[in-house]
Amino acid sequence: MDRISGLPDELLVKIISFVPTKVAVSTSILSKRWESLWKWVPKLECDCTEPALRDFILKNLPLQARIIESLYLRFRRESFLFQDIKLWGGIAISHCLRELRIDFFSHYANPYVILPRSLYTCKSLVTLKLLGLGIRVDVPRDVCLPSLKTLLLQCVAYSEEDPLRLLLSCCPVLEDLVIELDDANQNVKALVVIVPTLQCLSLKIPASCSDERYLIVTPSLKYFKVEDDREIFNALIENMPELEEADIYVTQHIETLLESVTSVKRLTLRQLYNSIDEYKCRAGIVFKQLEQLELSICSDNWTKLVIWLLQNSPNLRVLNLDADSDYERYEEYEQDNWKNIQRSVPKCLKSSLKTLEFAGYTARPEERDFLSFIFKKARCLKTSSISH
């Protein structure tokens, strides 16, 4: 202990900044010197379900260092006090807060965590993460977050229709956006994401959400992930020329999304019901830069989709297939389809495909025929892995 106490205050503060806030606070009992060191830690994490810890930090927080880089708060309905969030937020924002995360998951609609209005005009805020239906996003008209680069909204409540459009329009440097809607998000009718600077976008939409179209205009996007469980897929997505990677999980009607992600190098697909028809698929959808394709098999006639993708991915190098263990066939397999397929061998099989992985293989006729076709036609194949 004597050797540690001999270190300068700056180094001691750096050391205790790597431990949980509760542990950092407990060091205040070690000696007179240690009594105030934790107050200079720039990152705070507080579980507000522990009244003693909450009260101690709130009592001492006004004396905190000039800058609070990160604040992480966790609330529960039974221990939530409305004045807490106002006090926490006000103090943190006045100390040049850069990162804020609030978790408040509750099975009840009320009470809501109402964020202080000053949060929506915080010039220093770079990262904002709000998780839980207990949090209500009430965006004021004067919202302005000039430094915000990362925004996560997971299952939060919204005060009025279309608050997201207002919020996003006032984040001029936003780069990373995650939106996860919940069954209770009735105020979000049409999801509109128009952010010229956005580079990463993740959307999760449950089946119970509105079937209204959502609009995405993100010309600088590099990574796109969408999980849409609605039966009716309805979206307008403008061209994303910078896109490098996409993860798509939909129930059906995947064509619109595929048309928007043709520039990707890595593509992951999961479609619950197969709606692709090789004779009706939109012309001109070619994945010229696609090198790695990962496909989850969970629908009948999945080979139609795979072959179509192979035919339109001339430079594909890696193919990963994963058969869903819960997948059950509802239609009779038509083996005659392979006669037509083998007349036109995809270009990637002749010149670029080097790796094949097939997980969840069960030796069904369609699987056997597909693998037989690949092994016969893939001239450049170097490695393959087949597993149950």
Swiss-Prot record:
Which residue intervals define the domain F-box in the entry?
Answer: 1-47
CDD domains for this protein: F-box_AtFBL13-like
- Residues annotated as domain FBD: 337-388
Q: Which Pfam families match?
A: F-box, FBD, LRR_At5g56370
The secretion signal range is none
Q: What is this protein called?
A: FBD-associated F-box protein At5g60610
**Matching InterPro entries:** F-box-like_dom_sf, F-box_AtFBL13-like, F-box_dom, FBD, FBL13/AtMIF1-like, LRR_dom_sf, LRR_FXL15/At3g58940/PEG3-like
